[in-house]
Each structure stands twice: as C-alpha cells, then as structure tokens.
C-alpha cells in the first residue's frame, strides 16, 4: 500500500485523542490522528511524525498523521489494518478462490469480514516491547465484546496486524486491559483461532511481511 508524499513535523501536544498540534518548523498546524490508542511511545512532545495533506472541504483539519517512530517506523493509521489483512490472505494461508464479505453481522455487532463463511475480526497493533506486539494499547470494551460473541459461536478468527516490522510475536496486553486478556483466553478455549502478521513500513509504503505467532502466556 503506497503513501502519498509525506510532510515531516514534530508533535507539540495531543488533544482529545484524535487531534495533534504539529510543528512544521515554520508554522504550527492541527492534524487528525487516526488512532484511538494511547500511543505513549509514539506520540509525545517532540516526537517525530509524518503526515499527509488532506484536500477536502469536508475535513476541518488540513493534515492527517500517517507515521510515527519508535526505533522503527510505525504506521499510525489504525483503519489500514483491514486493507492490510486482505493483502495478507495468501501469507496467512487464507487465500485462493475465496468469498470475502465485509461488515458481517453477529448478534448485535458487526465484525470486519467473512471468509468463505468464517467470521474474521481484525485488530491493529502499534505497541511493541522487546519484540512482542501487545494488544490493546487502550481498554477496549468493543473488542472484548467481539471476542465473547465469537466464543459463543464457537468458531471464527481474530487477526492482529502489526503495523511495524519489529514484532516477533503478538499477545494480549493484560496490564492495559485484563478483561480483553480474559476474553481472548476464553475465546481460544471455545474454538476461536488467532493469527498475526507484521509489516514492512517505509516513508513510501506499508506492506505485509510475514506471519508471526500469537502467544498465550500462562498466568
């Protein structure tokens, strides 16, 4: 997936989760941050950030954050995870002549995909510590609900898309959201499968790189 030409700036402050004040050297500008995570290792005063200009009268902010840096480049755009998942089907052993449906209903929720009738929920990961991708980066009641709904059905697949290259595996972030960790363990016991993929990120593009394991450490 290619990026448009990006503009470099440094973070001045974050406001209300989705707004960044960015220093472009010659001026300050508010930008949209398309990620609800806490991003403490990526978004802080003085942090480098790469942004794309937004040319739309419907948008109030002229820039949108695309990349941050935490030893490696990290894609901040959480919504890209679904597109990256579709690019990863062969890599994850899910490709071939398959029927892909988007936004599929399950109970009172909507899950991201159905692959030949198999429900799939995709999660974007940006936090990596010591080579281990951690999800979530902020408490997620919605994510926990989806896991229990898949567990009740007794099948389905959860895919973690790590939008950086340095994760060797993925696991639940118990210290951030114990409820999600418990739901993930329960879903696995009930028959839900888990996969993960990491990505190569440059200032020009992001692309799926390789499948990595999802770990379930013992309590």
Enumerate the language-model features and the residues they cover:
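A short acidic/basic microdomain associated with nuclease active sites
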Residues: 90-106
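Non-catalytic C-terminal interaction segments of nucleic acid-processing enzymes
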Residues: 2-3, 7-10, 22-24, 139, ...
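Flexible glycine-rich surface loops and low-complexity tracts that mediate binding to linear polymers
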Residues: 44-56, 198-199
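Short aromatic-glycine-enriched beta-strand elements
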Residues: 16-21
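OB-fold/S1-family single-stranded nucleic acid-binding modules
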Residues: 57-73
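Short peripheral tails and domain-boundary helices/loops at the edges of structured domains
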Residues: 68-91
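Beta-strand/loop nucleic-acid-binding surfaces
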Residues: 27-41
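Conserved catalytic cores of phosphodiester-cleaving nucleases, focusing on short active-site segments
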Residues: 111-137, 149-150
